[in-house]
């Protein structure tokens, strides 16, 4: 319909992307969350009424080092880890000797972090003392692979092994954590 239209993608995090939109430096912004009331109000004040609609869904995955035997925890456990109520692996399993739990996200302003704060912590800030921000999702996988006490949080699309053309094999360097709503 508009053959002369060209898009120049800018790959950035949610915070920078929203700021670019608010500053009217971009006209199109893909994000993983609905606009806040404040964002919506600012956009309406500056120009055209924003159109917001879902185009797809993604999932998040929790990953641990291959040497960590605890690969199944509850959503409540995750909430307690992120809120600082659980800080050591042996609080989840007395036999686990991995020490302090290090939680690793891709970056301080990622959509994954926003989702965890909004959906798991109900909008409350993360209070875990051992939070690490890697540069990107690949860095999270690498960090978890090298750090036995880490638990990484990534988009589920990062789990696939590129050597598997059927996309049914998880990465060999890490173990995917199973989450349960109830006690394991």
Model feature map: region roles:
Residues 1-26, 33-34, 41-44, 51-56, ...:
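Exported/periplasmic ABC-transporter solute-binding proteins
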